[in-house]
Structure formats: C-alpha cells, structure tokens
C-alpha cells in the first residue's frame, strides 16, 4: 500500500452492530469490518445495550479494518462518526464507566410519562422548539428515567461527576480519553431537548424534564474538528494523532451520503427501521401530518440545513424476526425467493410489524404486531412476503405524509441500507408509492456520509461537485402495478394497521 496515500475512516455505530469502513479518494471502500453486539430486553418494551460493549466492539472493528487495509495511522486523513440516534448513555466522568445500560431508541419504558406531558399540554412547546413530538423514542425522557430510577446516577450528579450523551458523544469521549464531551447538531436535534431554531439546549424543556444542563455535551457542527484520537487505539506503535472531523446521526449522514443537497431531494434508508428524509433547505418546515422536523446537517460556520423525517421502527428487524424468532428463513437473501413463490399462489395476507409500537405517521406506542388474512393454505412464503411488503407500506405512509406537507408529488426517491438489496422490495416500493427508486452502487451511504463530512472538513474532498462523481446509480425501479391493484393493496394495509391501534391499552 502506498505509504503516502490518504484515506478517510468512517465509524458506523448502528443498532445491532458496529462497523468501520475505510474509503479512498474516489469514495471506494478499501476495507471494512463489522461485528454484532448484544441486545438486552429486560422487560416488555425495554431495549438496552451495554455501552462498554459498544465501545470495545467499535474499537475492534476500527483496528480490524485498519489492519485489513494495511495502512498506518499517518495514512488516515480524518475520521467520521455516524451512529444510531436517540440512544443514550450516562457515565461517571472519572471512571469512564456507565451508571446504567444504554437505553435504546426502540425502548418504550417512558410511554406513561410521555402521555402525562401530553395531558399537561406540553406538546406544542416541545414541537415548536425541537421539531419533534412527545414520544419515548427520543432521548430526553430516557435521560430523565435514568436520573430518577438509578441511584448511582443521582449520586454522581450530586458529586458533579455525571455526563450524558448519545452514542456519538460516548465514542468521541472514549476515543479522546475523556478530553472531548461533544455532539453534533443532528444528534442533538433528536434528544427532544435541543432548540432547532436557536441552536441551543432549551432551558425551559430542561427544567420541565428536570435534566441539568451541566451533564449535556457541547454542540458542534457536523463537519469540523472535534478532537484527536489517542494513537494507542489505532495500534501499539501508532504515533500520528488522527482528527475526528465529521459527526452525524445515521439518517442525516445517509441523506448527506446520498448527496440529497438540494431542497426537495428524498432518501429512504432500509435498515433496522425505515427512515425517510426530505431536504427542506435553510427553512424548517413544521409538519401538519405527524412527521418530525430535524436538522439535516450543518457544515462548519454555514447555516443549518433542515429536513422533514418519518421513522418506521421495524423494517430490517422484521426480517431478523423471520430468521431468528419464528425461523421461517435461514438468511435475509432468501426473502426474494419466497416472495416470488408467494406470487404463484396469491393470498391477501398483511403483516403489521408494530413490535414496539407504530412510528410516523401514527405514533401509537400501544400498537402491537399482528398478521391478518391467514387461511388454511397460508404458507411460510406468504408470511415472508407480507413482512417484506409491510416495509414498503410503512415507507409509503411516510411519503404520503411528506407530499401533503410540501404540497407536491415526490417523483424520485434514493434508497440505501441492507434491505434495499432486495429487488422485490424495491420494485414493490416503486409500484405502491408511484415513484422512481434509485439505488446507488454503494448502498453503505450512512458510513459514506460520515466520510464525506469528515473529508469535507479536512480538505480531503474540495466540494460537493467533486463528491457527486463518486457514487453513481446502479439500478432504477419504476412503477409496475395498475392503479386498481395499488389502491386495493393500500386499502387492505390501512385496514390492517387500524386494527392494531391501542392494543396494550385494551387488554
């Protein structure tokens, strides 16, 4: 490997695994490493991660990817970090040890408290300041829960030893040996504590949730110098201090990675969940259709770019459920085969995968998963197909809400994430939503976005125009079903979703 050549390193800390991908000047993957980590479900509706395991897993992938690429620390121009959003960690700043497991974005334990806030009439205050709705999905009520329910957290707070942050903040703090306690605007905008108009932690909301400002990180742009990694984390002989220069939450990172840099451009990521974002430019559009307003990114001293976002909680994790829980598939790659098989004996089976409630545009944390339309002749392929179609139906719900908010039709949607590899899903999505689907050559655009942000700040790449040449479209999908068939399918889906509403409150 050329000893003088430079690379960008992207750390991608996801919901189920950590990855490191190393990119060259042409945006090509030089090497990668990925390792899954443990999911904990201590009670119904609770989801936790071990923050130390996330740290050691992420570090392990960094070292593995570096070793596979056969590069030295001085070959690394910069590091970008992207992460699962909303998931929070609270830790002792002296020992570096968490006071409790990380509470994951899927966790619903604060549902009752969120209902209380809504009954108190706080919904408008929260939405007008943060762009979000009151929901256990977001970080704020999770932080409050730890402060109220974990004695060690209260004790460390009293001793002024407590720090809090999302996963990006935790990794930055660990990589810099506790020198930097910071986050970026995109992650801050998902906490339900950050004012997206003033670009500051909102004191009124902090007081409402009883969260002291002192435990929260400094908020920086998505593309600037955060600090440098201790060389010991790269190798025993490493001496070069590699800068962290790009940070963004996974979905905003994906939007940037897809180069949706103009207002009106849309992307959908098919990962653990599904996340559809539309760039709205320098203007924050507040949704009338239960989408959330978020910061897409902020490049250095430039004004922030905003986005409308819809979130689906279960997408790829529904496929994982097919594989791991009910064991009807051996791996995700089999799904297209079974969908094709189901088409030979069609049935009207609908799967609503609301295992942890419904996200946008329903926001029903009491909904639970259900399968409708089962017959004596229903086979595994019909269940698989219904699960795949549910991903597209949920994404279509988001697109429909988005089109109402912006007042015009969306014609093109860029896609990425693991499940976008499914040609069956992409074709069905195109047909059901009446959009052209564009899938790039490299679908790892979340990691690519963090690389672009770090590379832009470090001068590795000089302009957006230069970036646009790096990841061409690999395949496009165009609508292929009649309007009559589409309307019938959508009617069945809407009926199925409706029947899952308010489930946990009614039994």
From Swiss-Prot:
Which residue spans traverse the membrane? none
Q: Where does glycerol bind?
A: 85-86, 137, 250-251
Q: What class of enzyme is it?
A: transferase
User: What does the entry list as the binding residues for ATP?
Assistant: 15-17, 272, 316, 418
The residues that hold ADP are 15, 19, 272, 316, 418
Write down the superkingdom of origin: Bacteria
Catalytic function, reaction form: glycerol + ATP = sn-glycerol 3-phosphate + ADP + H(+)
Might you report a single GO cellular component term?
cytosol
Q: Which NCBIfam families match?
A: glycerol_kin, PRK00047.1
Q: What is this protein called?
A: Glycerol kinase
Which species expresses this protein natively? Malacoplasma penetrans (strain HF-2)
């Amino acid at each position: 490997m050329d000893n003088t050549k430079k690379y960008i390193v992207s750390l991608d800390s996801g919901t189920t695994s950590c990855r490191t991908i190393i990119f060259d000047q042409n945006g090509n993957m030089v090497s990668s490493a990925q390792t899954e980590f443990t999911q904990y479900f201590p009670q119904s509706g609770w989801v936790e991660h071990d923050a130390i395991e996330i740290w050691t897993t992420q570090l392990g992938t960094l070292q593995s990817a570096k070793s596979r690429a056969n590069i030295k620390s001085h070959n690394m121009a910069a590091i970008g970090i992207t992460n699962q959003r909303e998931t929070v960690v609270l830790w002792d700043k002296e020992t570096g040890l968490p006071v409790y497991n990380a509470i994951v974005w899927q966790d619903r334990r604060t549902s009752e408290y969120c209902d209380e806030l809504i009954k108190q009439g706080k919904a408008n205050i929260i939405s007008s300041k943060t762009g979000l709705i009151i929901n256990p999905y977001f970080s704020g009520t999770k932080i409050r829960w730890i402060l109220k329910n974990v004695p060690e957290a209260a004790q460390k707070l009293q001793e002024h030893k407590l720090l809090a942050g999302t996963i990006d903040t935790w990794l930055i703090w660990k990589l810099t040996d506790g020198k930097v306690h910071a986050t970026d605007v995109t992650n801050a905008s998902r906490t339900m504590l950050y004012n997206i108009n003033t670009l500051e932690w909102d004191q009124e909301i902090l007081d409402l949730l009883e969260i002291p400002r002192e435990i929260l990180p400094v908020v920086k742009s998505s593309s600037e110098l955060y600090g440098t990694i201790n060389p010991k984390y790269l190798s025993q002989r490493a001496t070069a201090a590699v800068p962290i220069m790009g940070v963004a939450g996974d979905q905003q990172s994906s939007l940037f990675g897809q180069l949706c840099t103009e207002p009106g451009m849309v992307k959908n990521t098919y990962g653990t969940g599904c996340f559809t974002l539309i760039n709205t430019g320098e203007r924050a559009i507040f949704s009338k259709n239960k989408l959330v307003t978020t910061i897409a990114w902020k490049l250095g001293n430039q004004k922030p770019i905003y986005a409308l976002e819809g979130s689906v909680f279960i997408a790829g994790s529904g496929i994982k459920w097919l594989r791991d829980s009910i064991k009807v598939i051996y791996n995700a790659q089999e799904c297209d085969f079974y969908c094709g098989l189901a088409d030979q004996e069609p049935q009207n089976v609908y799967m609503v995968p609301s295992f942890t409630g419904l996200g946008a545009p329903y926001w029903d944390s009491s909904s639970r998963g259900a399968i409708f339309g089962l017959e004596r002749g229903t086979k595994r392929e019909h269940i698989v197909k219904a699960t795949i179609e549910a991903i597209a139906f949920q994404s279509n719900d988001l697109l429909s809400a988005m089109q109402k908010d912006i007042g015009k039709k969306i014609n093109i949607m860029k896609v990425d994430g693991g499940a976008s590899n499914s040609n069956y899903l992409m074709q069905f999505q195109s047909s059901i939503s009446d959009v052209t689907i564009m899938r790039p050559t490299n679908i790892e655009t979340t990691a690519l976005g963090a690389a672009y942000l770090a590379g832009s700040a470090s001068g590795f790449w000089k302009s957006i125009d230069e970036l646009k040449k790096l990841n061409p479209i690999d395949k496009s999908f165009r609508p292929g079903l009649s309007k009559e068939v589409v309307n019938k399918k959508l009617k069945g889906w809407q009926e199925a979703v409706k029947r899952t509403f308010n489930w946990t409150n009614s039994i």
